[in-house]
Swiss-Prot record:
Protein name: Small ribosomal subunit protein uS15
Stored SMART domains: Ribosomal_S13_N (SM01386), Ribosomal_S15 (SM01387)
Database matches in NCBIfam families: PRK08561.1 (NF006331)
Assembly and oligomerization: Component of the small ribosomal subunit (SSU). Mature yeast ribosomes consist of a small (40S) and a large (60S) subunit. The 40S small subunit contains 1 molecule of ribosomal RNA (18S rRNA) and 33 different proteins (encoded by 57 genes). The large 60S subunit contains 3 rRNA molecules (25S, 5.8S and 5S rRNA) and 46 different proteins (encoded by 81 genes).
Family membership: Belongs to the universal ribosomal protein uS15 family.
Molecular function terms from GO: small ribosomal subunit rRNA binding; structural constituent of ribosome
InterPro entries, per the entry: Ribosomal_uS15, Ribosomal_uS15_arc_euk, Ribosomal_uS15_N, uS15_NS1_RNA-bd_sf
Disulfide bond entries: none
Lineage of source species: Eukaryota, Fungi, Dikarya, Ascomycota, Saccharomycotina
GO cellular component: 90S preribosome; cytoplasm; cytosol; cytosolic small ribosomal subunit; nucleolus
Biological role: Component of the ribosome, a large ribonucleoprotein complex responsible for the synthesis of proteins in the cell. The small ribosomal subunit (SSU) binds messenger RNAs (mRNAs) and translates the encoded message by selecting cognate aminoacyl-transfer RNA (tRNA) molecules. The large subunit (LSU) contains the ribosomal catalytic site termed the peptidyl transferase center (PTC), which catalyzes the formation of peptide bonds, thereby polymerizing the amino acids delivered by tRNAs into a polypeptide chain.
SUPFAM superfamilies tied to this protein: S15/NS1 RNA-binding domain (SSF47060)
Taxonomic source organism: Saccharomyces cerevisiae (strain ATCC 204508 / S288c) (Baker's yeast)
PROSITE patterns for this protein: RIBOSOMAL_S15
C-alpha cells in the first residue's frame, strides 16, 4: 500500500495464504487458541501483539482460519476489546511524543510539520471510525487531552 504523506509507492507486501482451512500439521483446537487469545489480552497485549505471539510461539498462522473469527471479534465477545482502535491509539501516542519533543525544542520546524501530518491522519482515521460506529459520534481528538488517552 502506498504511503499517505510521502513519495513511497509501496510495491512489496506479504501474501496471505489462499487456504482457508487449518494446516494438516496444526494440532491445537480452536477453543484452546481462543483461551490463549483471552489470556494474552488479560495480560494487556494488543491484538497485533497477540497475533505475533500466537504465530511465533504456538504456530498459529492465522487465528481467523483456526477459530473462525478474527482476534478483535474474539476480544469483543469476551469484553476485552480496547476502547480506542489500535492504529488510532498508536497514532495518538506518536503525536503525544512529538508534542513533548516540541516543548523542549521549540524551533524544530520539521517536527512541527510532522506533527501536522500525524494529526491529520488521526482526524481522518477518527472520522472513519465514527462512521462505522467503532467510536461514539461525539468523539473528538484534542491535543490537550491526548496524553490522558494514551497513558
Amino acid at each position: 500500500m502506498g504511503r499517505m504523506h510521502s513519495a513511497g509507492k509501496g510495491i512489496s507486501s506479504s501474501a496471505i495464504p489462499y487456504s482457508r482451512n487449518a494446516p494438516a500439521w496444526f494440532k491445537l483446537s480452536s477453543e484452546s487458541v481462543i483461551e490463549q487469545i483471552v489470556k494474552y489480552a488479560r495480560k494487556g497485549l494488543t491484538p497485533s501483539q497477540i497475533g505475533v505471539l500466537l504465530r511465533d510461539a504456538h504456530g498459529v498462522t492465522q487465528a481467523r482460519v483456526i477459530t473462525g473469527n478474527k482476534i478483535m471479534r474474539i476480544l469483543k465477545s469476551n469484553g476485552l476489546a480496547p476502547e480506542i482502535p489500535e492504529d488510532l491509539y498508536y497514532l495518538i501516542k506518536k503525536a503525544v511524543s512529538v508534542r513533548k519533543h516540541l516543548e523542549r525544542n521549540r524551533k524544530d520546524k520539521d517536527a512541527k510539520f510532522r506533527l501536522i501530518l500525524i494529526e491529520s491522519r488521526i482526524h481522518r482515521l477518527a472520522r472513519y471510525y465514527r462512521t462505522v460506529a467503532v467510536l461514539p459520534p461525539n468523539w473528538k481528538y484534542e491535543s490537550a487531552t491526548a496524553s490522558a488517552l494514551v497513558n
